[in-house]
Amino acid sequence: IFFVYFYQRNLLYNPNENNYLNDKISFNYKEIFIKTDENIKLKSWFIEKDLKKFKTILLFHGNAGNLFNRVYKLNELNKLDLNILIISWRSFSGNEGKPTEKNLYHDAEEAVKWLNSRGVNNKNIILYGESLGTGVAAEIGKRNVFGGIILESPFTSITKAAKIYYPYLPVNIILKDRFDTIEKIQSITTPILIMHGKQDNIVPQKMGLELFEKAN
């Protein structure tokens, strides 16, 4: 119990995991750094086509890897008439700082502000969260109205997900970061698309179905 309590964020956030690194980049992008008010620079990729004509996807990645691990996804999204901004959380992709639930929300808000500063209003932004990023998208989506929200492989909460892997631990007591999406989703007025595969071996599909039912 003591190990899990003190090292839980090392288990939850895995910036050094590397998979899908051999995908060839088939899009043009600018590497930018979004500065937080704590002076942390968040490495990000920006695929800009036409900010006035097309909506902009703001992509929040999952709990492992870096920007290069999302090339396969960006290759597909780039086929659509969309601008795309993908940010890398603090401590990921060489960024400074420590990842926590509160800090990830802050990073996401800074990305929204960055787009706003370039003339993109919230109704032209589509929040796209994958796995851990779905918890961030839900929180940011609860705070404001956006053009849309996409949740790919979402969990109901980190607490419930942790119970699957650590059924013998009192996770509801010891967890610091909870990302309680199931309690937020009814407060979101932005249209939501939920995608969840049957063969997901990390987050069970039933969690996506629970969120769908709760949202409706």
Regions found by a protein language model. Name each.
Residues 1-35:
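An N-terminal hydrophobic leader/cap segment in hydrolases
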Residues 36-118, 123, 130, 134-135, ...:
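Membrane-embedded segments
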Residues 73, 181, 190, 204-213:
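Short alpha-helix in the alpha/beta-hydrolase fold that links the catalytic acid
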Residues 170-184, 189-190:
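Active-site nucleophile elbow and catalytic-triad environment of alpha/beta-hydrolase enzymes
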Residues 187-189, 194-200:
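Short beta-strand/loop motif that positions the catalytic acidic residue
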